[in-house]
Swiss-Prot record:
<keyword id="KW-0223">Dioxygenase</keyword>
<dbReference type="Pfam" id="PF00355">
    <property type="entry name" value="Rieske"/>
</dbReference>
<dbReference type="InterPro" id="IPR017941">
    <property type="entry name" value="Rieske_2Fe-2S"/>
</dbReference>
<feature type="binding site">
    <location>
        <position position="213"/>
    </location>
    <ligand>
        <name>Fe cation</name>
    </ligand>
</feature>
<keyword id="KW-0520">NAD</keyword>
<feature type="binding site">
    <location>
        <position position="87"/>
    </location>
    <ligand>
        <name>[2Fe-2S] cluster</name>
    </ligand>
</feature>
<feature type="binding site">
    <location>
        <position position="85"/>
    </location>
    <ligand>
        <name>[2Fe-2S] cluster</name>
    </ligand>
</feature>
<comment type="subunit">
    <text>This dioxygenase system consists of four proteins: the two subunits of the hydroxylase component (HcaE and HcaF), a ferredoxin (HcaC) and a ferredoxin reductase (HcaD).</text>
</comment>
<dbReference type="GO" id="GO:0019380">
    <property type="term" value="P:3-phenylpropionate catabolic process"/>
</dbReference>
<feature type="binding site">
    <location>
        <position position="105"/>
    </location>
    <ligand>
        <name>[2Fe-2S] cluster</name>
    </ligand>
</feature>
<dbReference type="Pfam" id="PF00848">
    <property type="entry name" value="Ring_hydroxyl_A"/>
</dbReference>
<dbReference type="InterPro" id="IPR054883">
    <property type="entry name" value="3PPDioc_HcaE"/>
</dbReference>
<dbReference type="InterPro" id="IPR015879">
    <property type="entry name" value="Ring_hydroxy_dOase_asu_C_dom"/>
</dbReference>
<dbReference type="GO" id="GO:0051537">
    <property type="term" value="F:2 iron, 2 sulfur cluster binding"/>
</dbReference>
<dbReference type="InterPro" id="IPR020875">
    <property type="entry name" value="HcaE"/>
</dbReference>
<keyword id="KW-0479">Metal-binding</keyword>
<comment type="similarity">
    <text>Belongs to the bacterial ring-hydroxylating dioxygenase alpha subunit family.</text>
</comment>
Amino acid sequence: MTTPSDLNIYQLIDTQNGRVTPRIYTDPDIYQLELERIFGRCWLFLAHESQIPKPGDFFNTYMGEDAVVVVRQKDGSIKAFLNQCRHRAMRVSYADCGNTRAFTCPYHGWSYGINGELIDVPLEPRAYPQGLCKSHWGLNEVPCVESYKGLIFGNWDTSAPGLRDYLGDIAWYLDGMLDRREGGTEIVGGVQKWVINCNWKSPAEQFASDQYHALFSHASAVQVLGAKDDGSDKRLGDGQTARPVWETAKDALQFGQDGHGSGFFFTEKPDANVWVDGAVSSYYRETYAEAEQRLGEVRALRLAGHNNIFPTLSWLNGTATLRVWHPRGPDQVEVWAFCITDKAASDEVKAAFENSATRAFGPAGFLEQDDSENWCEIQKLLKGHRARNSKLCLEMGLGQEKRRDDGIPGITNYIFSETAARGMYQRWADLLSSESWQEVLDKTAAYQQEVMK
């Protein structure tokens, strides 16, 4: 069995000096350890409460590569179970979502209630004349399930910090999406799913820490949707400018702490500035006063930027796209993209949000394709022995971290930096090399203290 010491994790990651060895994106032994020590003990996004509003409603998803089913209980609580029959390991729930009174395995017909209990075994008296203790053979339950403002998370590790402690200061940034209006948020439409041939850490890192790429990777989109030859701005809808936000913002920051990351620009008006539909742009202006009252000016105006909750939950303010990077081996990720909107928005505005998110960040989105091409090409190159063992530079903004005095929390830097990437890989390494959560927390705290010296 390969151990963390065999893999020399801290020789692959040097966050103090800004170095990363890209073997972390290709090594199958590292990947197996990730499934155990990251996806097996971190809080992972499961579903939005709006997707399972009634008792018996269920939604099928994954925790790492483990299939799980999330179910609303009769008392309104939420449980999650390993989607695996206890008889021969067959899947017991196949539909993406729906409503049910029971889950029945198609192999031998064992049936489970929505509370996970084994309730029926075909031919039980004849097949098990010695008796079968059905209470012992219920579905394996995810022991830790908690919600944060509509987002449902699960964790296999009962020794992990609670969800709110795990989120830490990233919750302040997350609230900018979840808490703009009374009534919270909901998922609109279905789930878009597609596969990208890259390691899960590539998109997670980009959403945590990389605004820098947009100036170059998305240059063609900026040129097409940007200024006209005569110097005037093209318009997409009701008075919305398509000029890049980095040209119009008065300030910008990146947040990186506890493995999580976020980056955004300070703007002077509620303009999403990411080429959304005119109805969306108008909606942000019309609801700005309520958002400012609930969140304050900075977050109410924050309608662009990138975010990732470690390890794999990402979102983009303004475009209403929320996505999970489900790992499928060291060189493949399955993307699940949701459109998340204010519940109080009109049906017309919700449709405009869905259209905007799909156009820019759906599987054929004009920005999404740029990102996917980059990640796939990187993964191809890392098949080479020299390529996957050559150190990469992670020095942007090194030593420039600070804590702000304006109420914006956490360790921050200028938006064009790699503070969040270094923090993400530090938490990644700490998890892989630690036997307990307390050891992880101690290591992360020591790193963050060193960063802020």
